[in-house]
């Protein structure tokens, strides 16, 4: 499959994606892995058949990534330190009975120990080799303009700790009209509230891949070419860059979607920005 890719340099702003669960080095996050979903590392089309990357395309990104992580974790509103989604809804159950549920998850990510990072430049020659994979070819030709996401950066830390606290508050109110002598009809009500809270903590030591950088490519079936669309900057979990975030009371609050009734669901990934050097 011939390709035409825009030539991009190492310099510029980089978006690093942080998955909820870290993995052992080289298991899920691999340079050159082609993903169909940038938030799902298991969607790789070529995880076990990635072609070797020429040394001249590799670059050590440790200094800037390490500095970015240290800077973020030192701030009280760190994009890596917290995320607090919440979902509130009122359900009308009928018969004058109403119930409301407030549910959410607060999470924290702590990174310590030695931080290392490597990035590579997926130039035209490498993409030509990468796109010869039969699974990649099949996926690219399956649909019109389907995007592909290539892992072009991996960051590893000596110790990673993820802590999640889930909380659900339920309220139920029952109201009805009753007869009251002389005064006439009135209303009485009863409200009950119950709160449930659980905490889950996951730790990993001995070297873990905790972040990856993804570059998006679009394949044109008509022209038979692949276009480099730059770093993927889609949906994010943490504030700090482009993505579904809103300001509330002077604080940037993450926006979470795809909640299901009776379930609190966190997005699979977060992100942070790094200013790369040439």
From Swiss-Prot:
The keyword Membrane applies. Changing residue 235 to A: Does not affect ability to trigger cell death during the allorecognition process. One of its GO terms (biological process) is programmed cell death. It comes from the Eukaryota. GO terms for molecular function: wide pore channel activity. GO terms for cellular component: plasma membrane. Keywords: Cell membrane, Membrane, Necrosis, Transmembrane, Transmembrane beta strand. The record marks 237-238 as: Cleavage. Belongs to the gasdermin family. This is Gasdermin-like protein het-Q1.
């Amino acid at each position: 499959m011939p390709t035409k890719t825009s030539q991009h340099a190492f310099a510029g702003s980089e978006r690093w994606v942080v998955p909820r669960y870290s993995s052992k080095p080289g298991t899920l996050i691999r340079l050159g892995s082609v993903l169909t979903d940038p938030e799902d590392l298991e969607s790789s089309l070529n995880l076990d058949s990635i072609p070797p990357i020429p040394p001249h395309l590799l670059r050590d990104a440790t200094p800037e990534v390490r500095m970015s992580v240290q800077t973020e974790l030192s701030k009280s509103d760190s994009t890596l330190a917290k995320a607090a989604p919440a979902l509130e809804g009122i359900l009308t159950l009928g018969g004058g009975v109403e119930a409301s549920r407030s549910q959410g998850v607060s999470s924290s990510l702590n990174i310590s120990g030695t931080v290392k990072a490597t990035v590579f430049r997926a130039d035209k020659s490498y993409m030509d080799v990468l796109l010869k994979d039969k699974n990649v070819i099949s996926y690219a030709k399956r649909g019109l303009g389907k995007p592909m996401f290539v892992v072009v950066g991996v960051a590893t830390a000596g110790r990673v700790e993820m802590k999640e606290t889930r909380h659900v508050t339920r309220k139920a109110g029952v109201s009805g009209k009753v007869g009251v002598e002389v005064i006439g009809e009135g209303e009485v009500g009863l409200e009950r509230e119950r709160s449930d809270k659980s905490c889950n903590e996951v730790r990993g030591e001995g070297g873990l891949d905790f972040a990856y950088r993804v570059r998006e490519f679009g394949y044109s079936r008509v022209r038979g070419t692949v276009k480099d669309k730059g770093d993927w900057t889609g949906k994010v979990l943490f504030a700090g860059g482009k993505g579904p975030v809103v300001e509330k009371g002077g604080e940037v609050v993450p926006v979470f979607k795809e909640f299901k009734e009776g379930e609190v669901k966190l997005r699979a990934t977060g992100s942070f920005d790094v200013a790369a050097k040439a």
